[in-house]
Regions:
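Extracellular/periplasmic, surface-exposed regions of secreted and cell-surface proteins
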Residues: 1-57, 68-362
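Flexible, solvent-exposed loop segments that connect beta-strands
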Residues: 62-65
Length: 363
């Protein structure tokens, strides 16, 4: 409207916008310990969320006299199963081992329904189905991720700790020809301040190092060939959309880190230092397909390799401690040097709000 006159503004007041949000979460944990050093824990959880957005221009609306209604319904269901078992055993008086195992399964389902209707027969309570012109859209997505792990922690004199483990994951988004992904890990820590040569008044110090792998799965339909249903003039048809990749798997990040945790002056001074070096292989990147295949969209492929390294430093000081008040000061500093090592033969492309090119940093 060209002016702020009350009569003009009042013509849009019947515009009715509503949003309704619902959330329901529940879960339970069962623990079984047949022995003091043998425990089992099973946790089940369920999370349901729903959002409905309703946009109504009623019958008699100034800009659309016969009215229009848009209704969008979004639902998400998340179901989780988590089991962990552990067994602790004293090998020697000063040597203890803790062996644990378990598995996890997560099901994530998303549904979205959208209806549009226009031109109602009268001023009755409007619904999408009561309109003379109706359009509907529906999207569904379900992803299951499941895995199991084994881990052992070796404790020697409460000073030396060696942790080794492995996790095996499967995901419904992986290609049919990929299979399972294995992620190993190992870490070592040394409580240096517990040694006899460490001065009693020189605080606490722990040295640590670790190596491990983690992964990021592709999207729900990235590995399968898909077709986009379209229609023109009432004639149904399909057009090519995603070419698919039966060997598509997760991108895998391997990381090595080393550092220390220190505490002095009765825990009033705390410092943390970490150096890390990451290398991501089989990075998920969009690769342009040959137009002769009939698929004009890009296809997600495991082709890239990216490296990251840097340091993380943290310092926390308890400047004032009293019964009535306290004053703490903290500062953190970090660096990250990244490089696109390889694009797997793909040409440079725009992504992540920047330009991806071999030999250059990641935006």
């Amino acid at each position: 409207f060209g002016s702020a006159a009350f009569n003009d503004v009042g013509q849009v007041l019947p515009f009715d916008i509503q949003k309704r949000i619902e959330r329901f979460t529940t879960g339970g944990t069962m623990t079984y310990s047949p022995l003091t050093n043998f425990t089992n824990r099973l946790t089940v959880g369920y999370d349901f969320s729903q959002q409905e957005a309703r946009n109504l221009r009623p019958f008699g609306f100034n800009q659309r006299p016969e009215g229009a209604l848009q209704n969008n319904l979004w639902q998400n269901r998340l179901l989780t199963f988590d089991y962990v078992g552990s067994f602790t055993y004293d090998i020697l008086e000063t040597v203890r081992t803790n062996f644990s195992w378990g598995g996890q399964a997560v099901g994530d389902e998303i549904r979205e329904l959208e209806g549009w209707g226009e031109d109602f027969p009268g001023a009755a309570q409007p619904t999408v189905s009561s309109a003379s012109v109706k359009i509907a859209e529906e999207e569904r997505q379900r992803v299951w991720n499941a895995g199991f792990f084994f881990q052992n922690v070796l404790d020697i004199s409460d000073k030396y700790f060696l942790t080794t483990g492995v996790r095996v994951d499967g995901n419904s988004a992986f290609g049919d020809g990929f299979g399972l992904q294995v992620y190993p890990k190992a870490s070592l820590s040394w409580v240096l301040s517990d040694e006899s040569f460490w001065p009693d008044n020189f605080g606490q110090m722990k040295l640590r190092s670790a190596y491990g792998q983690s992964g990021r799965a592709p999207g729900a339909f990235d590995a399968v060939r898909t077709w986009d249903p379209v229609g023109w003039g009432g004639v149904p048809a399909f057009v090519p959309e995603n070419v698919g990749n039966p060997n598509l798997g997760p991108e895998v990040t391997s990381e090595f880190e080393i550092g220390f945790d220190g505490s002095w002056a009765n825990d009033r001074i705390n410092a943390v230092f970490t150096y890390f070096n990451q290398r991501t292989s089989d990075a998920l990147m969009e690769v342009t397909q040959s137009p002769s295949t009939g698929f004009t969209e890009t296809q997600l492929e495991n082709v890239g390799e990216v490296s990251n390294n840097g340091i993380e430093i943290g310092l926390n000081l308890a400047l004032i401690e009293s019964f009535d008040y306290g004053l703490d000061f903290g500062i953190n500093y970090s660096t990250n040097n990244s490089e696109v090592v390889s694009l797997g033969g793909a040409a440079p492309f725009a992504a992540l709000n920047g330009w991806i090119e071999e030999g250059q940093p990641v935006p």
